[in-house]
Amino acid sequence: MSLAGAFNAFKSSTLVSWKSTGKFQQTIASCIQRTGKALHSGEVTTVKICPEFAGEGRYFDFRSSFIRASIDFAEETPLCTTLCKDGLTVRTVEHLLSALEATGVDNCRIEISNSDCEGRSVEVPIFDGSANEWVEAIEQVGLKMATDCSGNSCEKLAPFLNEPVHVWKNDSFITAFPSPKIHITYGINFPQVPAIGCQWFSSASFDDSFYAKQIASSRTFCIYEEVERMINAGLIKGGSLDNAIVCSTSRGWLNPPLRFQDEPCRHKVLDLIGDLSLFARCGSQGLPVAHIVTYKACASLYRKLCFFCFILFL
Ligand SMILES: [Zn+2]
């Protein structure tokens, strides 16, 4: 069974109902463009985000090919979320997609390019390791109501969870409960890194300002002792103390101060929103309206969630 098939099952199952959010679909008011270094490839990449019609959703435009920001094209890759279609890949999409989902940019074209005119792969810039750069850029130009090509506004749907769902792998899990509003509770545990240890973060509510103030500025983190292994695996070629917070098992944080005492846990929430945004279709919300409780979740669990929905409800 393909991931696309599983998603369609999720979409048509009784587990979720696609209902109106009471809002209209939006897009960005005008284009924004940012250039920066990518974390894993180290390349310099330019991203231009442009307004799009309602119903078109979010999609990347790479080498004049369109790759929808959808679970249909998501690939499991180490340490980042990748979209892949027809041999073209766009890596590390999660922070950008998290910012677009959380701020309500439901429809947009994301042009992305690097200096390698022949390459088949491109990567979204990392900036400071958080979603701040994107949120600030979006706030600068603002949003507008998106209309379809006939000039009509379109209501924005969201997946509302009807029944509890629970998936797990070893000691990590994702549980989601029906809830009239989005709540996210996230736990991480690094017993071998005392400066991080066990952390839990729980969102009180989830409006745009909560994300901008409490989540967007939390940065990617990594364990110092794992950096060499990642470099040997061809990852984090663009990594530096400017685009991640680095923690040593014995010496604690190497580049303080943290922006939040529980910044690593908040960053996981940022990533989760980016990954769940891939459930969006045709300008809808991707993030399920539910109380989501996760502990040590990883990207593969989201896939498992998708399959879980298929197995149980068809
Ligand atoms: Zn991240």
Specify the residue positions occupied by each region the protein language model found.
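C-terminal regulatory domains involved in ligand/effector binding and gene-expression control
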Residues: M1-D106, E111-L314
